[in-house]
Amino acid sequence: TVFQEFFKKAKKLNTDIIYVGGDIVHSKTQGISPELIDRLSWWFTKMAEICPVHVILGNHDGLILNKDRQDAISPIISALDNPNIFLYKDSGVYSTGFDGVNWCVFSCFDEVGWKDVRPVAGDINIALFHGAVWGSKTDVDWEIEGDVTVDLFENFEFAMLGDIHRRQFLNEKKT
């Protein structure tokens, strides 16, 4: 399968970190089947056997408009209780496990916490975000009028953006 090929390649490359940028499932909280739980448990466990796995949630992983409901991913990761899997459900600044390198999470389930996400001076700060960014393009070249602009990420050395589904640069410098 594609996943087995990915696992082989990640092992061969001696991958240090796997980052999953959300939209792991499409069903939000509806239609969660035993097969889905089984496949996700297998997928997360196999990745965690290779290296630490860092995960943020996407809009399809839970109900953005009803944040009191549990998302589809948290209970699976919690039940796995694997010390090599890290889920960042709340906005904040977290260690990547490498000295001087931080995840700066802007969670789509915790927009209130965005104001507290600030880069750490002297460190490498990687913004993680799952959502529509103004000016990004879909895989059919449709330009998105997003919820945020790239200015949200201007103080960070890097930004890894989920939800866009297409590799692209969103600034003139192509950084």
Residue ranges and their predicted role:
Residues 61-151:
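Conserved catalytic scaffold of divalent metal-dependent phosphoesterases
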Residues 1-94:
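Core catalytic region of metal-dependent phosphoesterases/phosphodiesterases
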Residues 134, 139-175:
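Conserved beta-sheet core of the metallophosphoesterase superfamily
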Residues 17-23, 52-59, 86-91, 106, ...:
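Active-site neighborhood of phospho(di)ester-bond hydrolases with catalytic His/Asp-centered motifs
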